[in-house]
């Protein structure tokens, strides 16, 4: 399982790659589209950003995986969006958009998890490393007047 240092370093490198290439590189990772998720820190109240992949893009919705490489604990961003589900997302280095995070129920998760692990088996490997069920989160655009 990756250490906090490794995860933070990988995020910094990913952001730097996007920045120095003016978005030409780093918009995909392992064949999945990349996005930058900004949550509000549950303890600090400050914006916190992380680079993630979206193994499923469903129209304007993105499905993200709270795997943390199969670590026994959920990633910090997952805890943050549980507290404040309104987030900002920059998809493939595009403009930031307000979105709402919906943690999927077991029934909603099952067909999507099967699809994700069929297309990207590494997620199945992550699940084998941990006893926790790896959550899936659907990000949906905030609609006007909502």
Located regions from the model:
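Extreme N-terminal tail/first-helix region
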Residues: 1-28
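Short strand-connecting beta-turns/loops that link adjacent beta-strands
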Residues: 57-59, 94, 144
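Short, structured beta-strand-loop surface elements
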Residues: 68-120, 129-133, 141
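Non-catalytic, usually N-terminal nucleic-acid engagement modules in DNA/RNA processing proteins
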Residues: 126
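Short beta-strand-to-coil "C-cap" segments at the C-terminal boundary of structured domains/repeats
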Residues: 139-145
């Amino acid at each position: 399982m990756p250490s906090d240092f490794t995860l933070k370093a990988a995020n910094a490198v990913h952001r730097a790659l996007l920045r120095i290439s003016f978005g030409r590189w780093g918009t995909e990772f392992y064949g999945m589209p990349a996005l930058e998720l900004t949550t509000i820190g549950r303890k600090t109240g400050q914006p916190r950003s992380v680079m993630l992949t979206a193994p499923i893009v469903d129209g304007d919705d993105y499905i993200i995986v709270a795997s943390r490489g199969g670590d026994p604990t959920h990633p910090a961003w997952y805890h943050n969006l549980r507290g404040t589900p309104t987030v900002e997302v920059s998809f493939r280095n595009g403009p930031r958009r307000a979105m709402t995070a919906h943690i999927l129920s077991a029934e909603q998760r099952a067909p999507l998890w099967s699809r994700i692990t069929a297309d990207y088996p590494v997620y199945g490997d992550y699940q084998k490393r941990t006893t926790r069920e790896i959550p899936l989160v659907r990000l949906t655009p905030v609609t006007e007047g909502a």
